[in-house]
Regions:
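Positively charged n-region of N-terminal signal peptides that target proteins for export
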Residues: 1-6
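Carbohydrate-interacting regions of secretory-pathway proteins
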Residues: 21-230
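Bacterial N-terminal signal peptides
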Residues: 8-18
Length: 230
């Protein structure tokens, strides 16, 4: 009887932890569950989402890992639009790898300047990069608070957008917690012209993943999921 009484609290604790884990997962939708090209997503040119990628260029999932096609310079963009959401995923780059996450982007123009792009890049991709062009930065607009990127390893990313508030963690470390309305200065595009200030960027749009690694070095993404917020 004493053994039974001792086991009961442990059993209850295990059940409680299991319930907590399920509750934490509630509302999340996995993004890439089936092998092959992801359904509900389109592949476009990297600098203008209105331009489809070259014929035959695809992104594909195998054994739960998403990888881009062989052509450098593409985005994989959701057909669905999102307003307020939490996006979680793991990403692994090689040396000189360059990726990014499109947030609330329209289906035209460059997500880095016409929507928002959270940069994910190996520091060797551009050794002259400004802070806002490093991993965790909102590209050319908002520098991350710290660098916690792990080169050539899996990195865990969590992005939360609700209204004008953006929070982002990488490997469990908070790198962004900002009020987007505070960023009222134009941002320079790659051609030197002005892009809208972050405060004026869309409040609703698509999400996406970028492949811009040098020498077409691969990127890998897994365990991607999204939860829409009310």
């Amino acid at each position: 009887m004493r053994t039974a009484r001792l086991l009961a609290p442990a059993t209850l604790l295990a059940a409680s932890l299991a319930l907590s884990a399920r509750a934490a997962d509630e509302g999340f939708t996995p993004l890439f569950t089936a092998d092959g090209p992801p359904k509900g997503w389109v592949v476009t040119e990297w600098n203008d989402l209105a331009k489809p990628a070259a014929k035959g260029v695809t992104w594909s999932v195998k054994d739960g890992v998403l990888t881009p096609g062989k052509l450098r310079g593409t985005w994989l963009v959701s057909e669905k639009e999102y307003t307020d959401f939490v996006l979680e995923f793991e990403i692994k780059l090689t040396e000189r790898g360059n990726s990014g996450v499109a947030l609330r982007t329209p289906m035209k123009g460059d997500p880095a300047f016409d929507g928002m792009e959270l940069q994910v890049a190996d520091f060797r991709y551009n050794t002259q990069a400004k802070d806002s062009e490093l991993t965790g930065g909102i590209y050319r607009a908002i520098a991350p608070t710290k660098q916690v990127y792990k080169p050539t390893e899996w990195n865990t990313v969590r992005i939360e957008l609700k209204g004008d508030r953006l929070k982002a963690t990488i490997n469990g470390e908070l790198v962004q917690d900002v009020d987007l309305t505070k960023f009222d200065q134009p941002v320079k595009r790659h051609d030197g012209t002005d892009a809208p200030p972050v405060k004026d960027r869309p409040k609703k749009g698509h999400i996406g993943f970028q492949h811009l690694s040098r020498n077409n070095e691969p990127i890998q993404i897994k365990n991607a999921r999204v939860k829409e917020l009310k």
